[in-house]
Regions:
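Short aromatic/hydrophobic "clamp" motif used to bind/position activated sugar donors
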Residues: 91
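Glycine-rich, basic loop-to-helix element that forms the pyrophosphate-binding segment
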Residues: 70-86, 99
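Acidic helix N-cap motif at the loop->helix transition within catalytic regions
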Residues: 24, 38, 49-57, 99, ...
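Short, well-formed alpha-helical segments that are part of the catalytic scaffolds
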Residues: 18-32
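Membrane-interface aromatic/basic loop that binds lipid-linked glycans or pyrophosphate carriers
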Residues: 278-345
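A conserved acidic beta->alpha catalytic loop
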Residues: 29, 36, 44-53, 71-73, ...
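Cell-envelope/extracellular polymer assembly enzymes that use nucleotide-activated donors
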Residues: 8-11, 29, 39, 196
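Donor-binding/catalytic cores of nucleotide-activated saccharide
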Residues: 99-208, 218-233
């Protein structure tokens, strides 16, 4: 049952690709939401296992489900297809191997309707396939209480990978549909596409409401995109998006700590990209033919130095959102001065 004072459909976009083992749990958690006014859009991205059958079976059970079948084009294209079909007042995303608490959407929409913000974001519990908690962000000081961030505050807490406390993904957030008009995922990129989409939402928004409750369960499984280690041409996607982030922030006329954090984030991303390249395990047709991308990473480190000038991030205390860990300072220094040593760190 929906809370009094909250009304309107939430469009939930679920990209589906070969997740037969996990899809039933995901869909049961969505259909079991205490907030009932849902449009559940399943975008089957050309699955070759039993996922298509499961989508059809669940659609027969519940009229709130709409199934869209596409040829395999990747998660970004699938999400964009879902955005085209969305009719709700609010829009959310769930990955098909994840699941959500029963009060996930009721909690988020209640916060949106009682706030002037256009985005609400909740805490995340990362888990392995056995349900055990995985600590993905040790040392991060995530807010322990509900908190509103204006646009620039949200950007500060999002851009620097060493001090990021706002999760980059789209799936632990609920967005005003009005905010998302004209914003789409980058179809040709497969890494950090969530980061780019969320950043552009932040830039357009008036900020967000953060609630610490861990209402979203994020599955980290062997072989998933986030855990893959092979270096390919797609490994430059993060650098592409950090370059775009700097340009978009400059275009918006935002300076001060925000642009400093963006520049620092770009340098750290360049150093990590060069490190992963030097470690090898490359696809033959990929980065060996990407000298321009490698040169862009090197140029960023040689012309920047914001990361080296930034204060050290402290595990317990400190409010310098442009701070950088000692590990990242060393990484940036070695990448700039003796790149081949990166394979050993």
């Amino acid at each position: 049952m929906n809370n009094p004072g909250t009304s309107g459909t939430i469009s939930v976009i679920v990209p589906v690709y070969n997740v037969e083992e996990y899809l039933p749990r995901c869909l049961e958690s969505i259909l079991g939401q205490t907030y009932r006014d849902l449009q559940v859009i399943l975008v089957d991205d050309g699955s070759t296992d039993g996922s298509s059958r499961l989508c059809a079976e669940f659609a027969e059970r519940d009229p709130r489900i709409e199934c869209i079948r596409t040829s395999n084009s990747g998660v970004s294209a699938a999400r964009n297809r879902g955005l085209e079909a969305a009719k709700g007042r609010w829009i959310g995303f769930v990955d098909a191997d994840d699941y959500i608490e029963a009060g996930f959407y009721e909690t988020l929409v209640t916060h949106l309707t009682h706030s002037d913000k256009q985005i609400v974001c909740c805490g995340v519990r990362a888990e392995d396939t056995e349900g055990n908690r995985i600590e993905r962000f040790k040392g991060r000081r995530f807010p322990a209480v509900e908190q509103d961030f204006d646009r620039d505050d949200a950007l500060l807490r999002y851009l620097n990978p060493d001090t990021r406390i706002l999760y980059w993904a789209v799936w632990n957030k609920l967005y005003s549909a009005e905010l998302l008009k004209g914003i789409a995922f980058e179809n040709e990129k497969v890494i950090a596409e969530d980061f780019d989409f969320t950043l552009r939402c932040f830039l357009r928004s008036n900020g967000l409401r953060y609630i610490p409750d861990e209402l979203y369960h994020y599955l980290v499984r062997p072989g998933s995109a986030i855990t893959g280690s092979r270096f390919s041409k797609n490994s430059f996607d993060g650098m592409f998006f950090m370059d775009r982030a700097v340009r978009e922030i400059q275009r918006a006329g935002i300076g001060g700590e925000v642009i400093k954090c963006a520049l620092i984030g770009r340098e750290i991303t360049a150093a990590k990209t060069l490190r992963d390249y030097q470690r090898g395990n490359r696809e033959a047709e990929g980065p060996e033919n990407a000298e321009a991308d490698l040169a862009r990473c090197r140029e960023t480190l040689s012309s920047g130095r914001e990361a080296m000038r930034a204060p050290l991030a402290r595990r317990n205390g400190g409010s310098a959102w442009s701070a950088v860990t000692l590990k990242s300072k060393v990484l940036c220094f070695i990448a700039a001065h003796c790149e081949k040593l990166l394979r050993f760190i």
